[in-house]
């Protein structure tokens, strides 16, 4: 049976894990690392690189290297202007007000780009397991809205994965933490500060039940923002000194981003760090260099507002769960940004206890997703996960009011109905405007869909009975229906296009992703064949040089001719010329090999001081030329390595 893999699709890094027996295993990628940078690069020749190879070439190719694409997932272009101004690549407005990344004149959706990262994760798992992988559990920030969840699901589909479950990142972390503590009753807080998003979830664990009591967060707060304060500090100082804004030069901005990220990481273990960027830009007076020393205390001053911002959702989540700080038994830190000492200090000061160091903040979410995959396949028993919807759901009613049907932090799956009526006499239809958010007025919340119920019989206002039903599945994805009780006529909407993509667009992107995968496979096959040809040329020349005089001319000549043919074919880099040339040299080699190996055996025998010794006897026996065993003398010899 096919395995269900768990994928943590992160803003900065991604990770994949799978259940092996009763234990979750994090799978290292082709580069040998357990996490993969969520970076995609479009390089010359049409090749697409993902992960470390993409990140390594970012400085020289900043406008075609895509990072932090998760910040655009499921958002409108009009909501993403701040993020768009912070990245070196070009973000434009697409259909349905969706953000699109422009590469060589083509517009890519965030879902397509995320799918490329997911394809890398899928391939990593397939190489490790030795079988095709078609199903996955993918994690999202707990505070992702319906559009962002849909966009993530679509990215999975484009990557060729059936997304069995969308699971909240803090919930996944709690699963990983609590799998071996199922018998203990405890309340835990999961503080999850990743590269682009922040979540806090309060959970209750006991008897194998993982129940989310409340969740809160900020989908625009993460490690990128901590990098940004350093980038602004460095760029502002450089502008004061040189009157040049490095943020306007994509290559300089990319170097600043990498330097800021490195400095942030170093300041987690050092009291100060030096940023040294030679030749960061140039003017008519010559090259300019950026050299700056930053102390940890300076970084903490710059990031103070961000740290404070993260604590507000924590207070709200505790309040929504009806708990006080002292009720929390354990605090778990998730996400690479929780390595920042100031974050750890603030969390410890708030809860009055040291956070648990028992989980790896970079891997724990993927491990939890793999466990959920195991629950779905039946490999993991006695675990029940009860998650919640992060935001309230409602519809717009008379006066532009947001009337909530399902409150935030309601356990899912759930279903709720409420009856409404018309606002005018003889109203033939009603528009159902579906909203997600906590604000009292409709305009202040996120629209996740609209649909109409037609054919209402003419009657005075307030007479028709329109029943509106919200149905949220275990993925947190919403279906809304409206029924006229008098006629039984109904209309429903599964909020599919809330991410801005139609089914046709998703299908088209799936086909393109498959084509890219085929192209990648062909590229690898070509590289392998070129390497094989190169190795064959080297080995043939070496063998002819060493043992050519031991081979008769009639057998050596076909090898030399085939070698020349292979060299010419190798220069063309065309497989249809290299493959037959390789076949030809292999065939020519076969006929010459008997004399070649015989010569080689004699040379080795000579090296051991025993011409015609045991090696020759062994080779002769293989070739059928040796005499009976009576003529073979047993000798002791030392293998020369």
Swiss-Prot record:
Induction: By stress conditions e.g. heat shock. Acts as a chaperone. Belongs to the heat shock protein 70 family. This is Chaperone protein DnaK. Residues 606-623 have a biased composition (Gly residues). Keywords: ATP-binding, Chaperone, Nucleotide-binding, Phosphoprotein, Stress response. The modification Phosphothreonine is found at residue 197. CDD domains: ASKHA_NBD_HSP70_DnaK-like. PANTHER family: HEAT SHOCK PROTEIN 70KDA. The keyword Chaperone applies. The keyword Coiled coil does not apply. NCBIfam families: PRK00290.1 (NF001413), PRK05183.1 (NF003520), prok_dnaK (TIGR02350). InterPro entries: ATPase_NBD, Chaperone_DnaK, Heat_shock_70_CS, HSP70_C_sf, HSP70_peptide-bd_sf, Hsp_70_fam. The gene is dnaK. Residues 596-641 are annotated as: Disordered. Residues 631-641 have a biased composition (Acidic residues). One of its GO terms (molecular function) is ATP binding. It comes from Christiangramia forsetii (strain DSM 17595 / CGMCC 1.15422 / KT0803) (Gramella forsetii). The lineage of its organism: Bacteria, Pseudomonadati, Bacteroidota, Flavobacteriia, Flavobacteriales.
